[in-house]
Amino acid sequence: MKKLEDLILTYKDFPKKGIEFKDVLEILQYPDIFQDIILKMSSNQFLKKAEAIISIDARGFIFGSAVALESSKPMIVARKPGKLPGQLLTREYDLEYGKNSLSIQVNALKKFNSFVIVDDLLATGGTVKSVSRLIRDQKKKILGLITVVELKSLKGKSKLDFPVHSIVTL
């Protein structure tokens, strides 16, 4: 049986020179491993206390949807520019390789007060921090982050002021 760490592929110089991109999509080709990851993510203690999940564009949707289904929690999406209709909350953030922004629909947040963020990977923490600020600006709570992979060398966890649970740390 394959090990999870073996399914996280590295692409050098992607999306630009000097970046080592960690790709989790290989996991989806192994349903038994994917299911095990989802069960582990769904059994997290701070998820049990959350009213809803927020997943981050785009690979976060894969894991967030499955965790939402397994845990019977509603899911809200944080999307990149130009992808959501309606009234939006938007925040810019820094990446290892540039800047971007994320938006969440205002109406989606009105229904809930406490959230867990689900994403595929924690690197520098910029994306997750951006989402957490969007939520907190609305006087809502972030109970934690659940992610498949944490890249320890990039120290993203140290930039967050809420619990982080990663299935694997590289």
Swiss-Prot record:
It comes from the Bacteria. Pathway: Purine metabolism; AMP biosynthesis via salvage pathway; AMP from adenine: step 1/1. GO terms for cellular component: cytoplasm. Keywords: Cytoplasm, Glycosyltransferase, Purine salvage, Transferase. Gene3D superfamilies: 3.40.50.2020. Belongs to the purine/pyrimidine phosphoribosyltransferase family. This is Adenine phosphoribosyltransferase. It comes from Prochlorococcus marinus (strain AS9601).
